[in-house]
Swiss-Prot record:
Family: Belongs to the zinc-associated anti-sigma factor (ZAS) superfamily. Anti-sigma-W factor family.
Membrane topology designation: Single-pass membrane protein
MF terms (GO), sorted A to Z: metal ion binding
Protein name, per record: Anti-sigma-W factor RsiW
Spans within the Cytoplasmic topological domain: 1-87
Binding site for Zn(2+): 30, 34, 37
Primary location group: membrane
Cofactor binding remark: Binds 1 Zn(2+) ion per subunit.
Species assigned in the record: Bacillus licheniformis (strain ATCC 14580 / DSM 13 / JCM 2505 / CCUG 7422 / NBRC 12200 / NCIMB 9375 / NCTC 10341 / NRRL NRS-1264 / Gibson 46)
Amino acid sequence: MSCPEHIVQLMHKYLDGDILPEDETRLKEHLQSCEGCKKHLHEMEKSIALVQSTSHLTAPANFTANVLANLPKEKRTASINRWLKAHPFLVAAALFAILMGGSFFSSWKNDHDFSVSSQPNLVVKNNTVIVPEGEVVKGDVTVKNGKLIIEGKVDGDVTIVNGEKYTASAGQVTGQIHEINEVFDWIWYKIKSTGKSVFGVKESKE
């Protein structure tokens, strides 16, 4: 079809119902002498009629659900990645726990040196720490890779790491007693100690 552009515009106005009477007359006169334009207009009328005839059709109620159900399943890695992005705090906490646990495990394996807390009235003989009878040791007492003998009083907690404890009949501990001889106990103890030092958390007495 090689009709002038203004004729094509008149066709569109005619189909939209916006054509002026004098323009409609001009269009009809042209169509009488141009078989191509007449055919083109007829095809457009058929297309419009087809669209209008299907306007009442609606998709089935479960159409969307069925389409979604038949889509390819999301890869597991994509699902995991989305979960990780949605829970950054949990991921950070888990990574922190893993890194700290690894560090504490390494320190447990490599640390075999004897050490003791620094209260002045503790008596140290070789790898044995003694709380003398009649003495009151203020604060927490920690002994690593050694033996603790309590004959007096400890006003605080007692922690024995990879060692042993003996309490005489007159010995007394006002706080808690922790004996750590397994790597998992050591890791848990270090995590709690780190938490107390960072957040100022105190353990409740049992």
